[in-house]
Each structure stands twice: as structure tokens, then as C-alpha cells.
Amino acid sequence: MRSIAIGHEPIKGGLKPIELIRPVPFCSPAFGFDKAAEYAKEQLKKIPTTYLRRHAAKLYAARFNSTTAKNPEKSANIFMRELVKRVDQIVTRSPLNITELQRDKRRKDKAKQLALICQQMGIVDFDKSMTLEQATALVISKYQKLAEFTINQIDTAPAYSTYEAFMKKGGNPEILADKLEIAIRRMTCDKWWQRKLNRARDMTLEHLNITLGLVNKKKSPYASLQAVNEFKYAKKSQQKWLDSMQLESDDGETTLDLAEVFKGSVSNPEIRRVELMVRIRGYEEYAQEQGMKAVFYTITAPSKYHANSKKYNNATPKETQAFLVNQWAKARAELNKIDVPVFGVRVVEPHHDATPHWHMLLFMLPEHEQVTTKALRGYAMQIDGDEKGAEQARFTAENIDPSKGSAVGYIAKYISKNINANHIEGEKDNETGGEFNNENGLVLNVGAWASRWRIRQFQFVGGASVGVWREIRRAKPEMLDKSTDVLREIFSAADNSQFAQFINLMGGAFAKRSERPIQISRVADGLNEYGEEKKRVVGLESCSNVLKTRLMRFALKKRSDSDAPWSTENNCNHPANDWQIGAGDRLNPIAFIPKEIRNNVLRGATYYEVDEQLKTITEFKVKNNQLTQESIGL
């Protein structure tokens, strides 16, 4: 027997070789054993990250060393060729090369390069003799070039849908130019590019994990171990930041711990779950009052969108979700043409291989049930509807009998599973067979999946505005003394969690936004860094009368440092490691730099922070009036 290592995996106390093994005499160079090992090593170099290469090496070695396959070397080489082909497709589609996927600094450098290219492409020589029409046309022309460049890099560009709509349908070119000018500022900003590249990094690495078979019920369901660990770290960092910050009113009389405010908001998973359940219960009660019936639908994408299928087309969960959204849009358009309205809720959750599927609880008039189900089934099965098992696996519709159980009961499990698993602890997951709990495990994996792919898990169809619901629940009874009767009734319904009554008072489940008696009231609040007008919610508006629900303004500040608060006038929306020093601006205490050495860092010193648990060293320094941060592994 002879073996050749094509990689190594860490074990306690050292490294274990990943070996190709052949018996005598087939292990000699004359039989191509050495060439086979070299081929494997060369192919493995094309796979990003040590972890993924190691996993691919183990899969290749397992096939190569098989004692049951007729031709194990051929089987292993076919596997490697197909795997590298899929990996190459993923990396080619990404704006990042292998090195940039792995290193923060390379992504920062690339962001600066792309922003600089856009700045050079966006240079405009305005002549004083230019008319407004000429200047507008010039801005639109410059945007078109920058958008084409940006789309080639990251498949999207800011305001591109607005630009496309204008080119197809026309409109006011001056209004368009104002919007495109803001988009141009984004495309010439390195921070904007860095956010986009970091997002591309997250999705590309997760896609690679999926295509290498690292996301499934045997390895890690719903999301890769890498995504789950990064999600856990992000949650831990978020909590640490929340604990370090507080809110202080403008007059300095009121101070609130940010962590406590968080616990009382819909950002708290339990409050979010309860609110969703209240809304769904209200939908059901309203439907019963209107004589409607409920149907529970489950829709799954064709097999070619599933990573565990032989037909897998290398699609990402994001692309699969886009496919499902498009098919749903077609079905709704068809129903709208024949005046068949529906309302309800959609829950998106992953299969164990990360492919999204939908659960929909829809309410409709009894006479509309068949045509609604026919439309949904038709578009769900429009692509590859004749493939094996499609009738059973791709679409199901279940009529809900109120005498056997409520509609809310059908959807409650899916809501809890995708938030915090409250009230379903210990229940078995159909996808993996594992048990739910509200601390980690499956719920954490689902959260990591939604976060990594930026997929909206819950979407209500029709009904009444939850924004108005939340805002009026902030009001106090004494605030409504001079309000209209309708406003007081709406407040009473919201204050007593009567969502069905709230829907009724807001004009019903199918009323247009313009027909609602109450709207959110917003006022201008300055410009953001791209010159875009910011809006601040102040309360509710009814018949030109404003009910102010936000009587105080708060600044965000560190609990241990009161001299430089975050506020809406002081870049409070910037990330915690990204602050700027502008002329006349106060410094934001966003940095993790100890106060006693902050001045030294501002004068050019470098500060290093060691994290023993994560085994990283983070370097902080000021460059071009901006605090930069880079982490490296120990």
C-alpha cells in the first residue's frame, strides 16, 4: 500500500493527512498514481478557503479510495471536475476573487478602487451656458454609464428600477435627475461599495458551502456552520453594544438604557412573535365576520433549485426566492384581472438544504376558492410541472375547517419556528428530525439563513397598516381628547389588541392606502451623506390634523461617555466602527478606543485590541479623517 497526502485536517494535537491510497502494484508512478494526486492538488487550489478545500479533498479521497466502485479513480475525477465547475461558476459570478473573499483588507481596497473608477467616470463639466434640459440629460447619461459598470460588478445599481421605469414610460426628467444624482453619490462612495462587497462575500461563501454539500440535515441544516457562527457572533456583538449605550432626551431630563428599549420593541423576538400572532388572529376574526374561508397553501420550487437534487442548477436561495416571488406576482395579477381579492400571510422558510419554500394562509370568499387555488397551482407548476413527484411535492392546498381547528393554529408553528421557538419547545422538525428550543440549534440556524440571504420571512397580504398600528399604540388616552371619533375608536382597538376591529376601522382588508382614515405623519429631517432627504416619524395624520405620538427626541450615547452623543444630527445611523470627522462636527463615540488614549489615536497612533476568544487582533487607526479597522487571525 502507498499513500499520498492531498491535504490535512486539524485534530487534537496536530494535523491528520487526507490521503489517496492504492495497493501494490497500482501505487507506482507507472500506473499514474502520482499524476492523480497532482491533478487533485491542482484542482483543489481553485476552491476558496482552507476549510472548503479540506472538505473537497475529503470527498475526493473517499471516492478515490472506494473499494466498492467499479472505477474509483474515474468516479473521483468526474466528481472533482463537476465540483470545480460549479465552484468556478459561483466565483465567476461574484465581484470578488478568491483572495478578496477571504481578506477584509482586500475588500476594502477593492471598494476604494471601484469608488475611484466611478468618481472618474462621473466627472461632469457643467457649462454656465447649459440649459436645465441639457444639464438634466448629462446627469442621466452619466448615471447610465455608472449603472452599467456597477451592474457588471454586483448585478444591481441604486435607483435602476426608477431609471428603467422612466425609459419605458417616461416622466419628469428633472425629478429623475435628482434621484439619479443621489444614486451617483452612492456609486462614488467607497463605504457604499464596501457594504455591497461584504454582502457579496457572505452570499458567495454560503453558496460555496451549499454546493460543497455542507448545508443539509447531516452536516448543518438551513445554514452552514460558518454562517451560524458569524450570526452568533453578530448577535453577541449586538447585545454587547446595546448594553453599552443609552438614550438621553434633548432636555437631558430622561435617560433610558438602550437594551431595555430594545426588549420592549418589535426587535425583541418574543414581542415580534406575539405581534404576528395578534395580527393573524385579527385577520381570521375579520374573515369570519365577512363570511370568508381560509385555505393553507404550501409551495415549493422545482427540483433544479434544490442543492440535494441531481438536477441542481447552482441557484442560490436568493434566486429561488425571486423565482417564487415572480410566480406569486403572476398569480395575483391574474386574480386581480378577474376581481378576486385575497388577504392573509406568507411565511418563507428553508428546506434543510437552504432552498426556500412558502407556507401561505389566505382568506377569500367561498365562491373564489377554486379559482384562487387553480391560479396558484398553475403558476407553482408552470416550470417543470411534469417532473417526477411534482404533484405531491410542489403544491398543496388544505381547506381549514373551523370545527376542527383555527386558521391561526396552522400557521403558529411556522411563525415560532422562524423566530424563537416559543411554545413549540421539544417538538420535532419535519426537515431534520431535531428538536426545537429557543436558545440555539435549529432556530439559530434558521435565523442565520434569513440573515445571510436577506430573505423576508413574514409578509402580510392586504389587511391594515402595521405601521399605523404600532404608532397609535404609542399614544396615551389624554392625547386624543381633541381628536376625531374615528381616531379614538382606532386607538381603542389598537390599545386593546383588537386587530379585526382595527382592520374594519381602517377601511377593511382591501382598502387602498389613500382610502385609509389615518396615515403615518413624517417631517423632513435634513439630508443624509448622499444628499437624500431623511424623514422622521412624528405621529399620525387624519384629515390634515396631526396627532403627535413622539413628543421627545433622544440622542444615543455611550453609558460611560456623555460628551459626544449619537443623534439624528450626528450620524447616529452609521455603523459602530465607521465614523467620520467633518469640519465643525463633534466626534462620535462609536470607536472601541479607550477614552484615555483616544487623542493619541487621532494624532496618528495605532491601537490594537486582542480578542482571546475569537483569536483575533483588531487594528484601529485614523486615515483620511476616518477610523479604519482591520482584524487578523492569531
UniProtKB/Swiss-Prot annotation:
Pfam families: Phage_GPA
EC category name: hydrolase
InterPro entries the record matches: Replication_gene_A-like (IPR008766)
The enzyme's E.C. designation: 3.1.-.-
Keyword terms of this UniProt record: DNA replication, Endonuclease, Hydrolase, Nuclease, Viral DNA replication
GO molecular function: endonuclease activity
Cysteine-cysteine disulfides: none
Active-site residues per Swiss-Prot or TrEMBL entry: Y410, Y414
Gene Ontology BP annotations: DNA replication; viral DNA genome replication
Role played: Probable endonuclease which induces a single-strand cut and initiates DNA replication.
Family, as annotated: Belongs to the phage GPA family.
Name used for this protein in its record: Probable replication protein P12
Record organism: Pseudoalteromonas phage PM2 (Bacteriophage PM2)
Gene name for this UniProt entry: XII
